[in-house]
Amino acid sequence: MTVFKRVVALSVLALAIVPFVSAGTVASKTNTSSSKTSESCSKSEFYFKEKDCCLPSGGPTPSSTHTPTPTPPSGKSCPPNGWYWNDEKTCCLPKWPTSTPTPTPSSAHHTSTHTSPSSTPTSTPPPQCSNGWDWISSLLCCTPSSPSKPSSTPKPSATPNKGNGHHYKRAHVARAVPACPKGLDACPIAGSSLGDYECLDTSAELESCGGCASVGEGQDCTAIEGAWNVGCDRGSCKVYSCFAGFKLSSDGTSCIAL
């Protein structure tokens, strides 16, 4: 009888220990899996820690079904260079890693008055949104700058001068140019059927650097592939830093894929 009691006691003790051993094993496996999250991405992907996911290097490839690229909802937009909207994540996602942008070499002889973000390598500069938009890190997208104000863009008069039609067209153009303050260019607004235009300083305007982009002049600095932080210096685009996976060109005007 005594032997029987001892056997029963040992059996109960063994059953009590098993759950703890199993729990420890599961916990160990979970921790190991979590620590390898960034290593689970394929060679054609990179890890984006802000959303804890793998993203395709260079952005999503065009769908074989020709599905249109998702566009941000009203009130949101993505930086024009290196970012795209993702409906599933409801935010903007980068086309390349964002954690280690390549800074401008200290030997570069830029004459720009802009302060290069690479002067503080410990902090990564935020993505550059289009004019009138600000980057919100918590939302991973651009939102309208506040306070939001109606556009004060001057518009040419719709009332024709007396005389024939040819005279009106010449006068119409003549009035449009002087309407902008000295030093600004009157750039037609793309898609406008009313002849509207905006006054831009094309010597420093990122999206119309060196000329009005709406008429095919100048350069859109925000469209430089691989560029993280750019500027427009006296009508010429300057690249200050690049996304990870790119290096700055020797002349500081583009980013070269590694």
UniProtKB/Swiss-Prot annotation:
Q: Does the keyword rRNA-binding apply?
A: no
Q: Where is the composition biased (Low complexity)?
A: 102-122, 145-156
Q: Which domain of life is it from?
A: Eukaryota
Keywords, A to Z? Signal
Presence of keyword Signal: yes
Q: Which InterPro entries does this chain map to?
A: CPL1-like (IPR048661), PriA/CPL1_fungi (IPR038955)
One Pfam family assigned to this protein is CPL1-like
Give the signal peptide range. Answer: 1-23
Region (Disordered) residue ranges read 102-128, 145-166
User: What is the annotated role of this protein in its UniProt record?
Assistant: May play a role during the beginning of fruiting.
Q: Which PANTHER family does this entry report, sorted A to Z?
A: APPLE DOMAIN-CONTAINING PROTEIN (PTHR35192:SF2), PROTEIN, PUTATIVE-RELATED (PTHR35192)
The molecule here is called Protein priA
Give the organism, scientific name. Answer: Lentinula edodes (Shiitake mushroom)
